[in-house]
A protein has these predicted regions:
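Short, conserved catalytic-motif segment at the N-terminal edge
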Residues: 54, 59-78, 168-171
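Functional-site microenvironments in short loops/helix caps that host divalent-cation chemistry
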Residues: 23-29, 49, 55, 59-60, ...
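N-terminal pre-domain segments of enzymes
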Residues: 24-40
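Short, solvent-exposed alpha-helical surface patches in non-cytosolic proteins
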Residues: 84, 89-96, 184-190, 206
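Sec-dependent N-terminal signal peptides
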Residues: 6-14
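Short capping motifs at secondary-structure boundaries
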Residues: 80, 95-104, 195, 359
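Short, structured beta-strand segments at or near domain termini in extracellular proteins/domains
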Residues: 346-361
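C-terminal motif of bacterial Sec signal peptides marking the signal peptidase cleavage site
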Residues: 17-18
Length: 362
């Protein structure tokens, strides 16, 4: 098999992107805390999202919604704190300096672990391919006839990682306030453990992203003409021509666009954000079938994606600088996608949450 074919196999394994679960500690009951104690002051860089009930999933007027965003279903959530912005390079740098942590993109690829996620008999790629690296976006030189063939705009770059977000010759110098990228699920969990935080559930993420606009397509309403003023996304023909109406070709510094009604920035576009939920194609249908309000849902019990049957995926939310109306339009607040737990790319990052319970028990 040629090296090019190995690369295609490799891309197939890791493209849709993002370990063990957080270790439990002795905890106070969440409901008791939220009912009987004063909510503590928000930690620096976070805001309080009050408890409430909302309808999760695509709204009826959203004509671009995908089937796995439906049907809408009722969810009840306790209040929680959430980061105002995506975790930045400066914040992640502090974590690495204090712990010496190495991200998955900085580690040599473990073929034995990888082949367990591949069809039996898949040959081992050449060692020159199994080197530390990550996925980079590459602009196409001509119109792409098949937008399902993601290998046309992604390439494996040895040496790409959070410190070198656009390849081995790039750096994050002068980009302290940009979102950290090339982060896998495992990397995000490690940061959370250090920071005394956790990843949001998918329901928490959408509730926070919607703010007080429960019945709209976007976090600001239904007017798509507002997109370039509010979101770092791809404008023009994807993946050929980005007109840069929003001012940025790739990631943008956090807080570059107006926040939502909760004061949260970049809940649409810039980078996809990891959540704690397993990605399961049928999960929304299962919740809706209960015909009741689900309290504090923790996601599906197992991953299920028939398009990636060998991959364990977590849900990512919010879309990225690559989302466009001609491709995925994932800056819509109900948009969701599966992300391989053990891979990373230049358009995936994360933000964290905390509860009064977590803060009281630290």
């Amino acid at each position: 098999m040629s090296i090019n074919n190995y690369i295609v196999i490799f891309l197939t394994i890791i493209t849709f992107l993002g370990c063990k679960q957080d270790k439990s500690k002795a905890k106070l009951p969440v409901e008791e805390l939220q009912q009987n104690i004063e909510i503590p002051e928000a930690p620096e860089g976070m805001v309080w999202v009050p408890a409430g009930i909302f309808e999760q999933g695509a709204v009826p007027q959203d004509q671009t919604a995908m089937q796995h965003e439906k049907p809408r279903h009722s969810v009840s959530l306790d209040g929680f704190f959430i980061d105002i912005t995506e975790v930045t390079n400066a914040q992640f740098s502090k974590f690495v300096e204090e712990t010496g942590y190495k991200t998955i993109a900085e580690r040599k690829i473990d073929w034995e672990a990888m082949k367990s996620q591949l069809p039996e008999g898949t040959p081992k790629p050449h060692d020159s391919i199994l080197q530390p690296g990550s996925l980079l976006f590459k602009k196409s030189k001509s119109t792409v006839p098949n937008l399902y063939d993601f290998s046309q705009w992604w390439e494996w770059s040895i040496g790409a990682n959070w410190k070198h977000p656009e390849g081995p010759d790039s750096s994050i110098k002068g980009k302290d306030d940009y979102p950290v990228v090339h982060i896998s699920y495992e990397d995000a969990l490690a940061y959370c453990e250090w920071a005394g935080r956790r990843l949001p559930t998918e329901a928490e993420w959408e509730y926070a992203a919607r703010g007080n606009k429960n019945g709209t397509i976007y976090f600001w309403g239904d007017d798509a003409s507002e997109l370039s003023k509010r979101v770092n996304s791809w404008e023009g023909e994807f993946p050929v021509n980005n007109t840069l109406e929003d001012g940025y070709e790739r990631t943008a510094p956090v807080k570059s666009y107006p926040p939502n009604s909760f004061g949260l920035y970049d809940m649409a576009g810039n980078v996809w954000e990891l959540t704690s939920d397993w990605y399961n194609l049928n999960y929304y249908e299962e919740l809706a079938a209960l015909k009741t309000t689900t309290k504090n849902p923790q996601g599906a019990t197992k991953a299920y994606n028939p398009n990636n049957p060998y991959i364990q995926e977590k849900v990512i939310r919010g879309g990225s600088f690559l989302c466009s109306d001609s491709y995925c339009a994932s800056y819509r607040v109900s948009s969701r996608m599966g992300s391989s737990m053990d891979s990373a790319s230049e358009h995936v990052g994360f933000r964290t949450v905390a509860t009064p319970e977590m803060l009281m028990n630290q």
